[in-house]
Amino acid sequence: MSLAGKKITVHDMSLRDGMHPKRHQITLDQMRNIARGLDAAGVPLIEVTHGDGLGGASVNYGFPAHTDEAYLSAVIPELKQAKVSALLLPGIGTVEHLRMAHELGVGTIRVATHCTEADVSEQHIGLARTLGLDTVGFLMMAHMSSPEQLVVQAKLMESYGANCIYITDSAGHMLPDDVTARISQVRDALKPETELGFHGHHNLAMGVANSVAAVAAGANRIDAAAAGLGAGAGNTPMEVFVAVCDRMGIETGVDVFAISDVAEDLVVPIMDAPIRLDRDALTLGYAGVYSSFLLFAKRAEAKYGIPARDILVELGRQRLVGGQEDMIEDAALTMVRAREVVA
């Protein structure tokens, strides 16, 4: 099936998911510079918050260089055509955080839950719709649920008022057939006017292929990040995805060369380490582990001498999900004790 002429919305993640590899330490000037570049390149939607969403600043998730309010206040006035979104995880972000974001000019709120827990999003989705926001239900770790189970959860979020639903490959574990099955069944189940999106990670180098599969199956919003700046091996690299879309005739409205310049000249220079598919990031995708666990596992390796890969495999075995970052330390300690017993 030809996708030529299909229009999609690309949504940049480099200033939100990109907070994870930066340990939430992106400066206000870096935020402004990258946001201006994305805006000029034609990116229509840019996400800006702590890596774990509004209210994410904590011992568990990490303290950012600046508050969400400061980041949003720095970026929003700089934009000429792009709009700003914010992520909110119920239990981390509150309705007061949501109101704050709205007052500062955020136009899109993405309410994120684990893929089996859509019922905890009702209050936040309902308020976002009442405030007139573009309201997105964001189902994380979607590889852990069957297409049929995702349909049930997506319809719950739609019933609460979400005008767009996201199928989110938080672990970068899916292959194109997995994406096709989930996106197509959810697309068939939702109202025709409800939009559908896909968020990928590049932990098996499938970010671009999975995103194209999502578009072919009916998604019209696709997350990506300039230079792939995001958790794990990064998000779908925006400049590559836009170039592939251009080759296929999919209309993104983003200039290929301009977004490539943003990636190369603005994003790559702020990386603490190259965003690449190393053995630990590969393990995230292979074992189906939440991408933002990568740095936690590397810190545990440095502290306890247990290889990060072994820790990540154990986290996958335990089927840990976002919000259980404290269990990474527990898993590492258990492995240390087991090693001592063997010795």
Curated annotation (Swiss-Prot):
Name the UniProt record assigns to this protein: 4-hydroxy-2-oxovalerate aldolase 2
GO MF annotation terms: 2-isopropylmalate synthase activity; 4-hydroxy-2-oxovalerate aldolase activity; manganese ion binding
Similarity remark: Belongs to the 4-hydroxy-2-oxovalerate aldolase family.
Membrane spanning residue stretches: none
Record CDD domains: DRE_TIM_HOA (cd07943)
Binding locations of Mn(2+): 17, 199, 201
Domain Pyruvate carboxyltransferase residues, every copy: 8-260
Biological processes, Gene Ontology terms: catabolic process; L-leucine biosynthetic process
Pfam families attached to this UniProt entry: DmpG_comm, HMGL-like
InterPro entries on file: 2-IPM_HCS-like, 4OH_2_O-val_aldolase, Aldolase_TIM, DmpG_comm, DRE_TIM_HOA, PYR_CT
Keywords of this entry: Aromatic hydrocarbons catabolism, Lyase, Manganese, Metal-binding
UniProt keyword annotation of Lyase present: yes
Catalytic activity, reaction form: (S)-4-hydroxy-2-oxopentanoate = acetaldehyde + pyruvate
